[in-house]
């Protein structure tokens, strides 16, 4: 986060018209705390309201709510991005979950391959769990 903080300071001083976005959604709240404007978050393809509500809560100064939503975002990451043993697991997890939600197909270009049946079932189970948890957040 040191590099991100330095970038935030430079942008604030020299290019305040530029947005500053973070990649790892696990750091979204932290990035907002030090001057970031949002993120490029894979999980936002699955649960866009969750990510928008975190940014809105932070912007409104409701840090407790923003932290609560960040915990749920961490849960999304933990649930879908670490299935399997390859570095492609984050892409596979997002694509498979998006496919299960009817957003897109889970076909992946070579050299990658979609999850097999067992992994897909795990994604479906975790999707149901996450959807139930998000429903309790009342937004």
Residue ranges of model-derived segments:
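Catalytic alpha/beta core domains of metabolic enzymes, predominantly
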Residues: 1-77
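C-terminal alpha-helical cap/extension of soluble enzyme domains
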Residues: 36, 47-139
């Amino acid at each position: 986060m040191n590099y991100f903080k330095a970038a935030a300071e430079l942008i604030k001083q020299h290019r305040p018209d530029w947005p500053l976005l973070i990649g790892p959604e696990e750091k979204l709240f932290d990035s907002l705390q030090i001057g970031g404007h949002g993120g490029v978050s894979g999980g936002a393809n699955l649960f866009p309201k969750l990510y928008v509500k975190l940014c809105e809560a932070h912007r409104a100064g409701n840090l407790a709510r923003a932290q609560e939503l960040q915990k749920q975002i961490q849960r999304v990451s933990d649930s879908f991005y670490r299935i399997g043993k390859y570095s492609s697991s984050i892409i596979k997890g997002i694509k498979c979950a998006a496919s299960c939600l009817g957003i897109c197909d889970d076909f992946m270009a070579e050299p990658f391959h979609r999850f097999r049946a067992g992994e897909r079932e795990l994604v479906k189970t975790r999707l149901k769990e996450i959807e139930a948890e998000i429903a309790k957040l009342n937004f």
